[in-house]
Design a protein with these regions (language model features):
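N-terminal active-site segment of His-dependent metallophosphoesterases
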Residues: 1-59
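Extended active-site neighborhood of metal-dependent phosphoesterases/phosphodiesterases
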Residues: 57-143
């Protein structure tokens, strides 16, 4: 059997110079990671969310994240993270930031992500290995 490689990457959260929370080091970290991925020459890349810093606020961050992944010139499959589409789904506001209703994942944010990165959840077979990706925060939410 031939050997082959794939990469799983997540939480790069680079932000954007156009966003209010931008820090240049975040983008530099992502660029370093993507440079290392290109050197590894994997057959595919799995992206496990948090491709953006403020993707729930700025469409341009989702679009920049896609351009950066496209530049790898390696097939990739992405699922969102809370920074991309919203946090866990909660029904009640609480005094702690952990249950902030305004940070809930929404169907609109899920649809925005899918328009940029494609449908999810996804599942496919590559070299007799099944890969599946989903966004667990929507479990039990009805979304």
């Amino acid at each position: 059997m031939d050997s082959w490689k794939f990469v799983h990457v997540c939480d790069t959260q680079p932000g954007s110079p156009r966003s209010f929370r931008y820090r240049p080091a975040w983008l530099e970290n992502q660029q370093t990671a993507y440079s290392q991925i290109k050197r590894l020459q994997p057959e595919l890349v799995l992206v496990g969310g948090d491709l953006t810093r403020d993707g729930t606020l700025h469409d341009f961050e989702l679009e920049e994240a896609k351009r950066n992944l496209d530049a790898l010139e390696i097939p990739y499959y992405a699922v969102p993270g809370n920074m991309d589409v919203g946090n866990k789904f909660t029904l009640l506001q609480s005094p702690t930031p952990n249950d902030d209703l305004s940070a809930n994942v929404t169907s609109a944010n899920l649809e925005r992500f899918a328009r940029v990165f494609g449908a999810f959840p996804w599942s496919f077979v590559h070299r007799n290995v099944r890969f599946s990706g989903c966004y667990a925060a929507v479990a039990g939410s009805g979304l």
